[in-house]
Amino acid sequence: MRRSPRSGSAASSHNHTPNFYSENSNSSHSATSGDSNGRRSAGPELGEPEGRRARGSSCGEPALSPGMPGGDTWAGSSRPKLAPRSHNGQTACGAATVRGGASEPSGSSVVLEEQLNLLPILDLRQEMPTPRVSKSFLSLLFQVLSMVLSLAVDGLVCVCREICSIRFLFTAVSLLSIFLAALWWGLLYLIPPLENEPTEMLTLSQYHHRVHSQGQQLQQLQAELNKLHKEVSSVRAAHSERVAKLVFQRLNEDFVRKPDYALSSVGASIDLEKTSSDYEDQNTAYFWNRLSFWNYARPPSVILEPDVFPGNCWAFEGDKGQVVIRLPGHVQLSDITLQHPPPTVAHTGGASSAPRDFAVYGLQADDETEVFLGKFIFDVQKSEIQTFHLQNDPPSAFPKVKIQILSNWGHPRFTCLYRVRAHGVRTSEWADDNATGVTGGPH
């Protein structure tokens, strides 16, 4: 049971003491039990630390915790602490110890109550755990570090974005500059400058006058061009004629070096009764062809002339025909020579009308007996003059010789003979002349 406060003491100091320990449901007083004499029991006070179970015997000596090593520190504290003193400078041990069980000293009971009220507060401050303070400090430090790192990362990201945007802007500006420079150079060099064009505007009459003058200039240029074209054509024709004459002169040179008895100048002639008919063109241009340089309607006697040039030939119809040459006398024939211009000088660009396969016959005086002298092939690609040896063995003299053409080199309408030569030995010249009635010219 609680004691009534003494006279002169403050009652509020005992009635409103806070409860600092949640385990105790009692008041902040020390749990004391009064005996019959009104004394407190020496039992342990609730909330009192174990280090204060015993105190020193002498006054002013602080109570030590017997359970700690060394016995020189307070329980729950890392440094030595002294026992609280009273307001008048005396220690708490001036009276009897709290747990000693002795009678109260003669000191004031108010001082003892104040000391008892201060003990739980001092014990609570001494027993506050330090690990919770360190943990809260570390968590705060970690939070600060994480915030700093997040801010640094955000700053780096912003810097990278700025750099990328600047690089993109620089690239775009560079490409645009290159395009504009190329366009400018193209306008300068590809488009003609405008300074060369007239700046004044022409009237309609001036425009017509200029057009008329330019038309007259064009007509003059056209006339001069036609004149130059005619001159070039004439020069080309003269040059071609000169070249043709040189070629014909070269062709007319006698490379055979044998006497020719099929020459009109020595008395040879053509037996027209036994010779094929001439080629006649059925086109309306036949008349003009007879007047032109390229004449297809030459008589067969042209093959007895030494003039060999393109177009100066005897043409007969088809690829088969014959010609009978009357010799100036009886001649023991040994060779026959055919001559045809090469394809390189032909106006038609080829020699398809040249004879290919032919046969040679010797005719007797009665014109009925024919002696076969040989069959030959004229190769137009080989040479323009080709001599063929006859099969006249034993040699016989003939007043006439027949050349029978069996085929040509592909021309479908006609075949051309340019020149035929007959070589051999002439016998009984005067007798043959009297018999044939042919007067020979000078040899």
UniProtKB/Swiss-Prot annotation:
It holds the Pfam family Sad1_UNC. Residues 267-427 form the SUN domain. Gene3D superfamilies: Galactose-binding domain-like. Isoform 1 is testis specific and is exclusively expressed in spermatids. The keyword Nucleotide-binding does not apply. One of its GO terms (cellular component) is nuclear inner membrane. This is Sperm-associated antigen 4 protein. It comes from Mus musculus (Mouse).
